[in-house]
Amino acid sequence: MAQEGGAVEQFGQWLWSNPIEQDPDDEMVDAREEEGQILYLDQQAGLRYSYSQLTTLKPTPPGQSNSAPVYRNAQRFQTEYSSPTIVTRSQVSELSLSHTRPPIRQALSLLSSTPRASNQPWVATLIPSPSARPPPRPSGQRQLMGRNSRNQR
């Protein structure tokens, strides 16, 4: 079991540190890398984030007269939240091909979609919902359901 934990840790380190790779035949159009850190002093915690976006133009194969360009867009967004009691890592990767040039995104716009649970009061608050089940009938009544159903007593 200890070896499994070590292998998972090694894989996590590799996944966290490897950059997005570019196809050597593609022409680079846009590249963006952004890193940052946010400290939450009230919780003795911190959030580290990294965002990479690479857009390349795929070459038209010889003998093909395709006038529409093909863009390859690779994005990776990673976060690591650390507090005295927990460390949470998250990574989202996206690869797409398109005939239109994709927009450049900001890492902070992606951060707003990954809120911390302690800042969201509705996460910790349980709100009872009405039961979908009808209230129990008195024990003397039964209801049959079907084509020719009638109430029986």
UniProtKB/Swiss-Prot annotation:
Residues 1-24, 107-153 are annotated as: Disordered. Residues 109-122, 140-153 have a biased composition (Polar residues). The keyword Transport applies. Keywords: Host nucleus, Host-virus interaction, Inhibition of host innate immune response by virus, Suppressor of RNA silencing, Transport, Viral immunoevasion, Viral movement protein. This is Movement protein. GO terms for cellular component: host cell nuclear envelope. Pfam families: Luteo_Vpg. It is found in: Host nucleus envelope. Transports viral genome to neighboring plant cells directly through plasmosdesmata, without any budding. The movement protein allows efficient cell to cell propagation, by bypassing the host cell wall barrier. Acts as a suppressor of RNA-mediated gene silencing, also known as post-transcriptional gene silencing (PTGS), a mechanism of plant viral defense that limits the accumulation of viral RNAs.
